[in-house]
């Protein structure tokens, strides 16, 4: 087979608006279940009720950009399907910028990068939290634009812009560093010299450091204009982070090595596709050595390649507080997308037909991921539906108890819930439940009926102690009134 027919193919031509629209439509199809099926997890239950003020915690944690977008721009209203569709579109746009930074030159390279980035199980898990659907994709777009500016000799603009990214989502720092390493490796492969690649890595890293320094200054000043004090979660503790070394092993064996242990519906097609991408990356590095690249060139390429699997969790070295679950590891989608671009661009220098191999692998990864996204969305829908149905059944008893105690049925109706031994309401694989999570036990009742006034803090604990041992729901006496507060004793 000759390359002549492929030279005229639109796959190897310029990436156009038509290609972008096609990628966007494919991404929408992949997220169709998540867009259509409504689901509310424990965070959604409390964050969608502005009276809770829960969005203030974003500012406490140093995510003041996230706080401004969700708390003020959207008034603590997640905006449903619109927000998810807008978020996917922003991710696709960010993918175009990042692919250009890395050195994509054909529609095939751009398309592979955009789809792997946007159709990602990591972002799908983020999107399960409704409040993230605009802010988190924006953080990726800001990081991609900032890195592009830094590596295009617009250092000051890039560093200033990068300071905004962690204010939206701290994991965007990992996204920026991953793009920098991928761009450096692409330069090394194309120019076959260490100096330009090293220069690009150093410039990018310096820009990130400057951007982070500015972010830290702005974050320290943020209480003056947000009115929200910072919490310990916004601090840096490298020694404490290193003491929690078990997290690093868990991430390496679950994500760098694609086992998917802590990801629901991580299927065999996804696993095989990621392993195939890793094999392609090894082949790219080996091809550099076999073509006379020299030991220094090959070792530096290998170092950059390994770095692509470390930068997605590098913030774990800064703080021991977060457990670094899949939501914090969105940069792995950038790693996988970057490998696809590097493999395509390397292969096409040999023969255009060779570039189809990594493109097929990328397509398989997107297909497997779309299945996982749909299955996860369906499970979350079932769990959320069951949560509300169960809460509705209890709500009838709450009204009866309030009426018998002479409480105003116009509201507010103070409420405390005891739910100490949670069990799954999911029909399939999702274990979490909004009814049982500590911070949403009372708020799910208010989500159904705004007359409910959740009791929190010390008063809640006092009431639960006064309640003592009571029958468990749905037995008689499991819903009762103490000091003008309705108490629901689930278990």
Predicted regions and their residues:
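Hydrophobic, aromatic-rich transmembrane alpha-helices
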Residues: 93-95, 265-298
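Membrane-interface micro-motifs in multi-pass membrane enzymes
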Residues: 59, 63, 108-151, 167-168, ...
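Juxtamembrane "helix-exit" motif on the non-cytosolic side of transmembrane helices
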Residues: 38-41, 119-129, 216-225, 286-290, ...
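Intrinsically disordered, polar/acidic, low-complexity terminal segments
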Residues: 2-60, 64-65, 70, 74-116, ...
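Specific aromatic-rich, kink-prone transmembrane helix
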Residues: 136-162, 179-189
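Perimembrane helix-loop-helix junctions
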Residues: 176-209
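Membrane-interface alpha helices of multi-pass inner-membrane proteins
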Residues: 155-171, 175-181, 206, 210
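Membrane-lumen/periplasm interface segments of specific transmembrane helices
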Residues: 200-279, 316
